[in-house]
Amino acid sequence: MSDTAYPQAPGSEGPGRVVGRAPSAVYPELAGSTAVVTGAARGMGAVFAEGLALRGVNVIAADIDLDAMKATAEAVNARQDALPEGTARGRVIPAAVDVADPAGHEELARLAHTEFAGLDHWVNNAGIFPFAYISDISPEQIDAVLKVNVEGVLFGSQAAARHMRPGGAIVNMSSVSAVRVRRGRGAYCASKASVAHLTESLAVELGDKGLRVNSIAPGYIDTEMTRWVQEDPTALRHALDSVPLHRLGSPQEVLGVLLFLLSDSARYVTGHSIAVDGGSRHV
């Protein structure tokens, strides 16, 4: 383990952390479109929902925890209402979804058409992270992670393919763990590798429909999912040692890539996984 004392980046809140800044790119073509975002009650999903709404995108924001989703949507909409007149403002509609249930995704697509008369983008963000060694993981844990992380992406993409307008984009959340394994994360790593390959297959099959499919592969991002790392000095040091930029990423930095992939700037980009990991896959 390195003994290097990593300096704080400008604007950072602590060693290895950086204050998230909103992406500067506006992408005006997104205004007036409609997106579904799963796993949107907290973490990166909540940042995605608000970041899209700030660019005039109407969002069906879904989570298995409906109460938390309603609270997040209410807060985002209140901040939207406080923006100056003339500012692009989307609305966030909260919804409940169990991503392991195909019918739940169909309901989200129906809601998008009912509330906003169409569907343009789909973000398969919901996921779970069970920490368990291969020798100890239970069949129930394996089943749960595959249902949420893999089947959830598949079922969401199927619904998107059936209901999205031509020219639409699907973005799936993979992970640096798809290519860089860690102890105690076997099932999670396998699920995220599956997402990366599923994304490629979807891109090939849905190209005829005029739909693009890409994935984002985050590394250590400052969210609730990495709180255990941040609260353990030894774990944090190990994490920072494995990142060439020597800090955690912010959800806003992942949002910037998401906005690009949904925008016209990426209209010839499909079947790819974009890493947002500070270079950690190369260490």
Language-model features, listed with the residues they occupy:
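C-terminal substrate-recognition "lid" of short-chain dehydrogenase/reductases
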Residues: 116, 154, 163, 247-276, ...
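Alpha-helical segment proximal to the catalytic Tyr-Lys
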Residues: 162, 204-208, 267
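Short C-terminal tail/terminal secondary-structure segment
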Residues: 2-26, 180, 259, 270-283
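Residue(s) in the substrate-gating loop at a strand-loop-helix junction
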Residues: 175
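Active-site loop-to-helix junction immediately N-terminal to the catalytic Tyr of the SDR YXXXK motif
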Residues: 137, 181-189, 201, 226
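Substrate-binding pocket helix/loop in short-chain dehydrogenase/reductase
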Residues: 133-134, 141-143, 239
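Active-site helix of classical SDR
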Residues: 157, 191, 199
